[in-house]
Regions:
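Compositionally biased, proline/threonine/alanine/serine-rich low-complexity intrinsically disordered stretches
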Residues: 1-73, 391-433
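Alpha-helical segment of the N-proximal tetratricopeptide repeat
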Residues: 45-61, 65-110, 115, 119-129, ...
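Alpha-helical repeat scaffolds
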Residues: 62-66, 95-104, 131-144, 168-179, ...
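Short coil turns that delineate tetratricopeptide repeat
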Residues: 74-75, 108-111, 145-149, 182-183, ...
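Alpha-solenoid helical repeat scaffolds
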Residues: 81-82, 114-119, 151-157, 186-192, ...
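Residue at a conserved register position within TPR or TPR-like alpha-solenoid repeats
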Residues: 87, 107, 123-125, 161-162, ...
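Long amphipathic alpha-helical scaffold segments
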Residues: 201-264, 283-286
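Intrinsic-disorder/low-complexity signal
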Residues: 240-417, 424-433
Length: 433
């Protein structure tokens, strides 16, 4: 399965009409029972156990209600999403469809967003609607996503198109724009790999895999690399079966080149201890467990704790210069301590220039740093920088003295002592290096 970084789809399943009254059901327009006509004498004649015929409303009534509701009520996107979510949780799938149709009928040009058409497509499916309507809803979703240029919307709609097997050309456009806007995220690249697999496009596959493997992925690097290799091999096999052997061999050759890494560093040890790597990169950034990836392409993809006694740093596409490796001690059990560690350093891994070096690092109170110099690095540009939240220092509020104690009228600042001072508000601490 391909990991996804968007919300999950609405629950699917047949609509269920509860037998008991549902207190959470939305208001509905119910027709009145037909009035009984009184005879000329002014009396109403009845028959014992007479059943009064009342025509029951059908599903069309809920559509009429929400159409009328949104004709006179304006609602924010957040409120609509909350309403749709609650209806879906309560398995009121026809109401989900009716709400979205009513809203989009009146606000499609002014308030509509891509997710609304995605939800509409799912609602049509849940209510066993026709495939043509689902396709149309996703077409509108794609148009909205493309107009928004929001990478989350682009990825979400592209994922829906691939899931349904619709309009691969449009899905490709959405994926390509998203991957350019967020090159540090894996989901657009994984979707591009899936699209290449479905369309048997070796060029797209090679480009997506190369971009994916040009970075380290903290917490899942080996799984992502394994997935990419598997997808390439399966596409190459399919190409061979279609008589496209030359394209298959070219694709496999590209994979070998993409899997190579400029810098690979691994630290291992024996004993009850935990150690992390901190690598100072040539242009000034530091990769460590707290900030695992830098804008220069390096990443701490694994930190050893407990029985997993291994920490790994990779920089598949690196800038030239000195890489200073420091070992941070997280803990070291005095009863079963780790006394030394093995540091494995590989440059130009998987190429004819590959160089391996192994060092034994004594794990004393002070651990000397190790410097590795790289030449021939393949990185040409930095990744986009996303600033972390700004730390704010708020001074501790002190209780102001009373007027009697001070002997004078309190100043406005003393009267509002709980408000942070202008010096404290917005104070920015230096980023650790």
């Amino acid at each position: 399965m391909i990991p996804r970084d968007q919300r999950g789809p609405l629950q699917a399943g047949p609509a269920i009409i509860p037998r008991k009254p549902d207190r959470d059901a939305p208001p509905a327009i119910q027709p009145q029972a037909p009035a009984l006509q009184a005879p000329q004498g002014g009396f109403i004649t009845t028959t014992p156990n007479q059943a009064v015929a009342v025509s029951r409303t059908k599903a069309t009534d809920r559509y009429q209600f929400w159409w009328n509701y949104y004709r006179t009520h304006e609602e924010s996107s957040a409120d609509l999403k909350e309403k749709v979510t609650l209806l879906n949780v309560n398995r009121k799938f026809q109401d989900v469809h009716a709400v979205l149709l009513g809203y989009l009928t009146h606000y499609a040009k002014t308030h509509s967003e891509p997710w609304m058409y995605e939800a509409l497509a799912l609602a049509i499916e849940m209510n066993k609607g026709d495939d043509k309507s689902v396709r149309l809803a996703l077409k509108y979703a794609a148009d909205k996503a493309e107009a928004s240029h929001n990478p989350n919307a682009l990825v979400s709609v592209a994922d829906m198109l691939l899931l349904h097997g619709y309009d691969y050309e449009t899905a490709g456009k959405l994926i390509d724009e998203a991957s350019m806007k967020v090159p540090h995220r894996e989901v657009p690249l994984l979707l591009s790999i899936l699209l290449a697999r479905n369309t048997k496009d070796p060029k797209r596959m090679a480009e997506a895999v190369d971009r994916l493997l040009s970075l380290g992925w903290p917490g899942g690097d080996e799984q992502i690399r394994s997935h990419a290799r598997k997808q390439v091999e399966q596409l190459a096999k399919a190409l061979h079966e279609e008589g496209r052997a030359a394209e298959a061999e070219t694709l496999l050759a590209h994979l070998t080149e993409s899997e190579s890494r400029d810098v690979f560093i691994r630290l291992t040890w024996l004993g009850d201890a935990g150690f992390g790597l901190a690598v100072d990169e040539p242009l000034g950034a530091t990769a460590r467990f707290q900030t695992p990836r830098t804008v220069f392409g390096g990443a701490v993809v694994k930190e050893g704790l407990g029985n997993d006694r291994e920490s790994v740093y990779v920089c598949p596409r690196s800038f030239d210069g000195d890489y200073t490796i420091r070992v941070d001690c997280i803990y070291n059990n005095e009863a079963k301590p780790a006394l030394e560690a093995t540091l494995e350093i590989i440059t130009h891994e998987g190429t004819p220039r590959e160089h391996k070096e192994t060092r034994i690092i004594p794990l004393g109170r002070t651990i000397a740093p190790v410097v590795v110099h790289l030449t021939g690095g393949r990185r040409k540009e930095v990744l986009p920088f996303v600033a972390p939240p700004t730390p704010v220092t708020v001074p501790v509020a002190t209780k102001p003295k009373s007027n009697k104690e001070k002997g004078s009228r309190p100043s406005p600042r003393a009267a509002n002592a709980s408000e942070p001072s202008s010096a404290g508000r917005g104070e920015v601490k230096a980023r650790p290096r």
